[in-house]
Amino acid sequence: MKKWLCAASLGLALAASASVQAADKIAIVNVSSIFQQLPAREAVAKQLENEFKGRATELQGMERDLQTKMQKLQRDGSTMKASDRTKLENEVMKQRETFSTKAQAFEQDNRRRQAEERNKILSRIQDAVKSVATKGGYDVVIDANAVAYADSSKDITADVLKQVK
């Protein structure tokens, strides 16, 4: 996905550069660097960790209980009565299915929330890029990852970072 995005950005940059006239002002911004430097990113990570802490603890407890039952079945299965062994096997299978279902739901919810929060931050960055570009009179702003070389005087990353913070 990232390679595709870089390729698309490079293609867009090349297409834009073909139509750019000499009078156009072009700037470079490193969005990924801004994203990594934002204090809000760490705050969001802690918020999400707290949000999902209860469910994660519950899943860990379920996993421990399931492992205990599986060990008991392996250890004592040959000496147990057939009815007791069958009952324990059924419990283990039901608990394994329940655990699997809850773990998948947890992962999906966690990924969805992380994507939501990441998109909020990226939207703030995009708004800051537009604001800085407008103030600086830039006609085109290209992500630094899509550029092979650019003069550092064209880099507006620091200005955008100040705007976002």
From Swiss-Prot:
It comes from the Bacteria. One of its GO terms (biological process) is protein stabilization. Keywords: Chaperone, Periplasm, Signal. GO terms for cellular component: cytosol; periplasmic space. One of its GO terms (molecular function) is unfolded protein binding. It is found in: Periplasm. Pfam families: OmpH. Its main location: periplasm. The keyword Chaperone applies. SMART domains: OmpH. Residues 1-22 form the signal peptide. Residues 102-113 are annotated as: Lipopolysaccharide binding. Belongs to the Skp family. Molecular chaperone that interacts specifically with outer membrane proteins, thus maintaining the solubility of early folding intermediates during passage through the periplasm. Homotrimer. This is Chaperone protein Skp.
